A protein has these predicted regions:
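Domain-length cofactor-binding catalytic modules of enzymes
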Residues: 2-37, 46-51, 61-65, 69, ...
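Short, glycine/acidic-enriched loop or turn micro-motifs at the edges of active sites
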Residues: 58, 86, 196
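N-terminal cap/recognition module
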Residues: 73-94
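Compact, glycine/acidic-enriched structural inserts
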Residues: 87-124, 129-133
C-alpha cells in the first residue's frame, strides 16, 4: 500500500457494498473474471480502506494475481496461496556481454548441476528436484529455521511429510526459473524465480482447508469459498501467521542459497574471468503477508503477484518464462 498515491493514476471501481478497488489499469484491459474476484474481496468486512490492483492484474486461484489486500483483524490463506513467499532474486556482476562465450552450454550445465530443479517420482524418494546429499552450507542455514519449524509441527503434525531441509537451495518446477540476462548497458545479471518449495505448498493447502472448514462450522457465507479466512483471536489465526512468516523466511533463504550456488558454479566453470557479483542484489517476495502500519493502524497486507513499493524499495518485474522478453529491476519513488 502507498498512502499518498495521486488519484489520477488509477481507476476507482466502486462495488455495491464494501470498500473501493483502486486499479492501476488505465489503458489496460481488465478481464471480467479478475474484476469479479476483486469485487468479491472488496465486500469482506475486514478489508482496510481499499483493495489495489496492479497493471498486470489477472484472474488467479484463490485471489486475483496482481492484487494488494489490506486486512484488519483477519487473514485469507488462499489469497497468499500455496507458493508462500514466492518471489525473485537478481544480482548484478561486473561482467559485460562481450565477455560471455558464444556458446553458453557449459555455463548452463554448471548451473543445472549446482541447483536441483524439476520434480520426479511425485516428489518422493529419488526426486531430482531435491538434494540427495545436502551441502554443508545448506545444513548450517537449515538449523536457523529448524526450531521455529519444529514448534509449528508440534501444533500441526500433519505438516510433517518430509522434503523440507533437502529442498532448501532448490528451484522447483512450474514457472520457476534461473537465467543469465543483460541490462541496457550490456552488464550481466543472474536472476531467479522461486519460493518456499514443498513445505510452503503443504502449509498453504493445509491452512486453506482448515479455513474453509471454519467457515462451514461458523455458518459464514462468502461470495467465494476461496475467501475463507481466520479472524484475529480465533484458534488458527496466530498459527497461520506464524507458519506463513516461517515459510516466507524459508523462501527468501532458498533464493539466497541458490544464488550463492549459481555464482559459485559459474565462477568454477572456467568459462569466464574472475568476476564480482552482488554489486546490486535484490531478493523480494511477490506472494506474501506482511505486518504493516498504515493510517495509524496496525494491519496485515497480503500481496499476490505484487511487491511493496515504498520510497527506495527495490523490486523485480519478470517477463514471461522461456520467451525473448524483458524483465525489469525497479526502484520505488
Amino acid at each position: 500500500m502507498n498512502d499518498d498515491m495521486p488519484e489520477q493514476t488509477y481507476n476507482v471501481i466502486v462495488p455495491e457494498k464494501g470498500v473501493p478497488v483502486k486499479a492501476w489499469t488505465k489503458g489496460v484491459p481488465l478481464e471480467d473474471k479478475a474484476r469479479q474476484q476483486l469485487l468479491n474481496v472488496a465486500q469482506l468486512p475486514f478489508i482496510f480502506r481499499w483493495v489495489a490492483a496492479m497493471p498486470d492484474v489477472h484472474w488467479g486461484i484463490g485471489a486475483t494475481v496482481g492484487s494488494v489486500i489490506p486486512t484488519k483483524g483477519a487473514v485469507i490463506p488462499a489469497a497468499v496461496g500455496v507458493d508462500i513467499g514466492c518471489g525473485m532474486m537478481a544480482v548484478q556482476t561486473d561482467l559485460n556481454a562481450r565477455e560471455l562465450p558464444d556458446d553458453l552450454k557449459r555455463i548452463r550445465g554448471a548451473i543445472e548441476k549446482a541447483v536441483p530443479h524439476g520434480r520426479t517420482n511425485h516428489g518422493g524418494r529419488g526426486d531430482v528436484g531435491a538434494w540427495r546429499e545436502i551441502p554443508t552450507r545448506n545444513v548450517e542455514l537449515w538449523q536457523t529455521l529448524k526450531p521455529r519449524y519444529d514448534a509449528i509441527l508440534e501444533k500441526h503434525p500433519k505438516l510433517d511429510r518430509g522434503n523440507t531441509s533437502n529442498h532448501l537451495g532448490t528451484l522447483g518446477t512450474g514457472n520457476h526459473f534461473i537465467e543469465v540476462c543483460l541490462d541496457e548497458a550490456d552488464i550481466v545479471w543472474f536472476m531467479l524465480h522461486s519460493g518456499s518449495r514443498g513445505v510452503g505448498n503443504r502449509m498453504g493447502n493445509y491452512f486453506i482447508e482448515v479455513a474453509r472448514k471454519d467457515m462451514q462450522r461458523l455458518f459464514i457465507n462468502l461470495p467465494d469459498k476461496d475467501l475463507a479466512y481466520f479472524s484475529e483471536g480465533t484458534e488458527y489465526f496466530d498459527d497461520y501467521v506464524e507458519a506463513v512468516e516461517w515459510a516466507q523466511d524459508f523462501a527468501r533463504l532458498n533464493r539466497h542459497l541458490m544464488m550463492e550456488q549459481i555464482v559459485g558454479a559459474v565462477r568454477d566453470s572456467g568459462e569466464l574471468r574472475p568476476f564480482v557479483a552482488e554489486l546490486k542484489a535484490i531478493n523480494c517476495h511477490h506472494n506474501y503477508v506482511a505486518r504493516e502500519r498504515h493510517y495509524n493502524q496496525n494491519i496485515l497486507v497480503t500481496r499476490k503477484g505484487a511487491v511493496r513499493a515504498r520510497d527506495g524499495d527495490m523490486g523485480i518485474i519478470p517477463g514471461s518464462m522461456g520467451r525473448v522478453r524483458t524483465s525489469f529491476v525497479a526502484r520505488a519513488i
